[in-house]
């Protein structure tokens, strides 16, 4: 059939004919499965489905005192692709992806904080109510800011992206400051009752850095002496060679 090779579509018929012709062995177990679920006969591949970005906003419509939800569909311009990449799956994007990118760009050290990635049932997010920043059973982190900002954009009338970001950050800073104060008070109370704490992670890191610096300084001093001795010996040999 021209350039199309349809041998794979006839694999079941080939196996049955081989057994019928007296070939030794049993009929493969997959023969009945392939008979129930035959291979596709369509030779034309369809391009992958496009995934538009849908945004929900609350808008105040003139003449209507109640704000109405408005869904904005942002269609992505389809760029011409190479033939080898034409049928690759299309990337799925969500609105919070951009919000998350902006927050961690402004707060890169939030990525250094330890995070819990294990979920008990996989539906933990369904129990959260992002009308407020702090959620029971969830540690305060950058994702809290992202979800809080998204809730403000979806539920507060005429809310802009920058204003929602400022509100979410202000609440986040206030709660983070409260956590720091509680941590300091707990340490002071423990030390007042006789507790002794070891070096912090920052102090341990500085000590390791100092050790590496001292080792490098010793190595650099030795290398400098070797270079000086080599240059001195070369100067001496040149002076001896002169008449």
Swiss-Prot record:
Belongs to the mitochondrion-specific ribosomal protein mS23 family. This is Small ribosomal subunit protein mS23. Component of the mitochondrial small ribosomal subunit. GO terms for molecular function: structural constituent of ribosome. It comes from Emericella nidulans (strain FGSC A4 / ATCC 38163 / CBS 112.46 / NRRL 194 / M139) (Aspergillus nidulans). The keyword Ribonucleoprotein applies. GO terms for cellular component: mitochondrial small ribosomal subunit. It holds the Pfam family MRP-S25. The keyword Mitochondrion applies. Disulfide bonds: none annotated. It comes from the Eukaryota.
């Amino acid at each position: 059939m021209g350039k199309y090779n349809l041998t794979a579509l006839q694999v079941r018929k080939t196996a049955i004919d081989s057994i019928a012709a007296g070939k030794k062995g049993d009929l493969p177990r997959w023969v009945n499965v392939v008979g129930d679920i035959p291979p596709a006969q369509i030779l034309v591949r369809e391009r992958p489905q496009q995934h538009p970005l849908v945004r929900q906003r609350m808008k105040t419509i003139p003449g209507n005192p109640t704000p109405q939800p408005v869904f904005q569909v942002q269609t992505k311009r389809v760029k011409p692709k190479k033939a080898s990449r034409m049928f690759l799956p299309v990337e799925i994007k969500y609105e919070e992806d951009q919000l998350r990118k902006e927050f961690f760009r402004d707060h890169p050290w939030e990525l250094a904080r330890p995070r819990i990635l294990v979920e008990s049932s996989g539906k933990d997010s369904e129990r959260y109510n992002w009308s407020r920043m702090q959620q029971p059973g969830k540690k305060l982190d950058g994702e809290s800011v992202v979800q809080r900002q998204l809730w403000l954009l979806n539920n507060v009338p005429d809310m802009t992206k920058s204003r929602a970001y400022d509100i979410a950050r202000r609440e986040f800073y206030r709660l983070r400051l409260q956590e720091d104060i509680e941590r300091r008070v707990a340490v002071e109370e423990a030390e007042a009752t006789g507790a002794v704490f070891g070096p912090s992670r920052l102090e341990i890191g500085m000590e390791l850095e100092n050790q590496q610096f001292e080792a490098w300084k010793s190595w650099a001093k030795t290398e400098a002496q070797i270079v000086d001795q080599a240059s001195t010996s070369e100067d001496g040999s040149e002076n001896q060679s002169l008449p």
